């Protein structure tokens, strides 16, 4: 290890000394050059080239064929090719805010003997630059670096293998090649001469390559041996400016220079370089207008004798159909025709993808370096573009105007050794950290408790020792797993936190848990005991068990097995008074008001013949509700199954559904914050029961505001179980199923994988909670952030809870409880289902929110009492 470090220091010193001999800031990489052959001075330019070995972590070395070597310069004879991975990147240290001319060279040279030129893409950082599909080409771009590290990436787009021969960077002055936005991609750079050949460094101090153009037949080349004053920052070579082209006949009025743009809609910048090479007599004048696409861009211009001037537009231009025409048009007072020495054109490339937060990039690279991680995908920008996201990372980049942030780091089973490094705390937005199944030693660092966004920490399967920091144990909404660390001291006493009432909340350190979950665990255990007792003593209760749901309840039998609570169609007609009063309409059909025996009010949902829901879902809902009973699940009074006449008969919910109240469709008073929290809590309890109280567990699959019903006392009941699914195998964590649900509420992970878990309901509930907080539509096509979660996420960056809270509440709420509810909703909607809370945890947190709001209301009531007047 020491030998490697010493070698790196020596190599760095050599590189520094070598580069000091070149113009300041020049980077010259000979890709594929061995360390032993580095550095060397290229004979024609005098520039010093070094191996690319320290600038890229992947790739193999190749050489062009022997017969071609004599035709090319030494840097172009070797190459680096990338058979492995999709994106392979060079990482270069640069100066942030500096404009660079970036020049990679690609000379295939049949290095692989296949004689097939590869096709691949080139990226600058996270943004696509250009496709490389030709042999012996140099690509150029003028680009301002947004950080102190510049990454040039080769991306495989098919079966062919990307390669590169040289990579060169040249810093430029800020006040040349100015543009409004974006980067400038090389289109052409020409000068006019009778002598063939290119002009480059050292003639051009910026190492631009100038291509010679022969004049047209009716044009001539002017030359001079005198020195040209080229000190206008563009610093064109003397050889370029000592020649110019002009019409042979003085009477010629116009010089034309056509070219085509690809794609035709491209914007471009044009830079024209002039210097008068003839000493004009007193009676001679050279004056002309610069006309681009028929528009005069510079009027009555006269080049100065032996002094270079550059004419350019400050705004980008476009050409009709991509066909461009530059004209130099002689003015009426001019005695001589126009002339021009050189011109350049660059197309505008907008790079819309913002690089990942600089501090977090530095942090993750330090982590990579410290642990010696050599993951194939860990190259380029960690988060963007999304298709190249680093393995083990999740990022939040929903807002295009702000840098992406790292939200999850999974280094499980990565062979990590040593301690948990302090650098991790610089990932300030990290929500999930998984360092499990490594060989980490030392203690559990206290800084983990100070990371405000952190919700999940998995340190299981390591060799950690010492005591778990109390701050970490006491942190709320944190899942902590330290299982499999035999040297770690976490006794029951050290892992206990006292609640406000002096009760003990045991936090199991061997499974992921949420802070302050004791009461919910107790409730769940009590419920299970209750269910077992009732199962073992069926004679104690005539009703079916409210906890056990048979595994075959989703059988494909043609009729419903249970005959209890079955009504005839004639009875349905009677109870609805021939379907007199409509309560609502949905995808299932029409819902009518009715009464049983003239006393019990009911809602009768008739299955439409055109319903997409169908008999299967009708049957599923009946069999579920006949067996499952909970105060927060809508009660099934009965059903009708008579030929094609299918009806579900529910208990009547006088106050309709939550959506009607949030949208104002129902009229009446606005639901205050306390009532909303009560509704959310009761709906959550209904879901918690489906997930934990039923065996096998049930997943609702269609949790939304229209399926949350309210009775006359605003008690809440979850409804519409037609899409519900059970997990028939005990211990099964998911089922694979066709995606079903409502757009906007649908779990993206479930949609993507077809794997249904109870966490899919948790996601949907998070959406419901955001709707209750904000009173915003779930999907709004007129909103920049169309989905409610994106909109809330963007607003939260401002730190003002009022900006997202329903204005109808008029600020009448405890801001702490609103913040807690928002945080809970966002955690429910975490992209990774593993990091979402369970419904038990959601219930507990909502109870705390409601308690906080209730105590505020009580204190306000006391605060309005008349106080005694001072005497």
UniProtKB/Swiss-Prot annotation:
<feature type="glycosylation site" description="N-linked (GlcNAc...) asparagine">
    <location>
        <position position="396"/>
    </location>
</feature>
<dbReference type="GO" id="GO:0106310">
    <property type="term" value="F:protein serine kinase activity"/>
</dbReference>
<feature type="binding site">
    <location>
        <begin position="583"/>
        <end position="591"/>
    </location>
    <ligand>
        <name>ATP</name>
    </ligand>
</feature>
<keyword id="KW-0433">Leucine-rich repeat</keyword>
<feature type="glycosylation site" description="N-linked (GlcNAc...) asparagine">
    <location>
        <position position="458"/>
    </location>
</feature>
<feature type="glycosylation site" description="N-linked (GlcNAc...) asparagine">
    <location>
        <position position="489"/>
    </location>
</feature>
<feature type="modified residue" description="Phosphothreonine">
    <location>
        <position position="737"/>
    </location>
</feature>
<feature type="modified residue" description="Phosphotyrosine">
    <location>
        <position position="750"/>
    </location>
</feature>
<keyword id="KW-1133">Transmembrane helix</keyword>
<keyword id="KW-0808">Transferase</keyword>
<keyword id="KW-0723">Serine/threonine-protein kinase</keyword>
<feature type="glycosylation site" description="N-linked (GlcNAc...) asparagine">
    <location>
        <position position="179"/>
    </location>
</feature>
<feature type="modified residue" description="Phosphothreonine">
    <location>
        <position position="568"/>
    </location>
</feature>
<keyword id="KW-0067">ATP-binding</keyword>
<dbReference type="Pfam" id="PF13855">
    <property type="entry name" value="LRR_8"/>
</dbReference>
<dbReference type="InterPro" id="IPR032675">
    <property type="entry name" value="LRR_dom_sf"/>
</dbReference>
<feature type="repeat" description="LRR 3">
    <location>
        <begin position="453"/>
        <end position="474"/>
    </location>
</feature>
<feature type="glycosylation site" description="N-linked (GlcNAc...) asparagine">
    <location>
        <position position="283"/>
    </location>
</feature>
<keyword id="KW-0597">Phosphoprotein</keyword>
<keyword id="KW-0812">Transmembrane</keyword>
<feature type="glycosylation site" description="N-linked (GlcNAc...) asparagine">
    <location>
        <position position="295"/>
    </location>
</feature>
<feature type="glycosylation site" description="N-linked (GlcNAc...) asparagine">
    <location>
        <position position="463"/>
    </location>
</feature>
<keyword id="KW-0732">Signal</keyword>
<keyword id="KW-0325">Glycoprotein</keyword>
<protein>
    <recommendedName>
        <fullName>Probable LRR receptor-like serine/threonine-protein kinase At1g51810</fullName>
        <ecNumber>2.7.11.1</ecNumber>
    </recommendedName>
</protein>
<feature type="binding site">
    <location>
        <position position="605"/>
    </location>
    <ligand>
        <name>ATP</name>
    </ligand>
</feature>
<feature type="glycosylation site" description="N-linked (GlcNAc...) asparagine">
    <location>
        <position position="439"/>
    </location>
</feature>
<keyword id="KW-0547">Nucleotide-binding</keyword>
<keyword id="KW-0677">Repeat</keyword>
<feature type="modified residue" description="Phosphotyrosine">
    <location>
        <position position="650"/>
    </location>
</feature>
<keyword id="KW-0418">Kinase</keyword>
<dbReference type="GO" id="GO:0016020">
    <property type="term" value="C:membrane"/>
</dbReference>
<feature type="modified residue" description="Phosphoserine">
    <location>
        <position position="736"/>
    </location>
</feature>
<dbReference type="Pfam" id="PF00069">
    <property type="entry name" value="Pkinase"/>
</dbReference>
<dbReference type="GO" id="GO:0005524">
    <property type="term" value="F:ATP binding"/>
</dbReference>
<feature type="transmembrane region" description="Helical">
    <location>
        <begin position="513"/>
        <end position="533"/>
    </location>
</feature>
<feature type="domain" description="Protein kinase">
    <location>
        <begin position="577"/>
        <end position="850"/>
    </location>
</feature>
<feature type="active site" description="Proton acceptor">
    <location>
        <position position="702"/>
    </location>
</feature>
<feature type="glycosylation site" description="N-linked (GlcNAc...) asparagine">
    <location>
        <position position="93"/>
    </location>
</feature>
<feature type="topological domain" description="Extracellular">
    <location>
        <begin position="21"/>
        <end position="512"/>
    </location>
</feature>
<dbReference type="InterPro" id="IPR011009">
    <property type="entry name" value="Kinase-like_dom_sf"/>
</dbReference>
<dbReference type="InterPro" id="IPR008271">
    <property type="entry name" value="Ser/Thr_kinase_AS"/>
</dbReference>
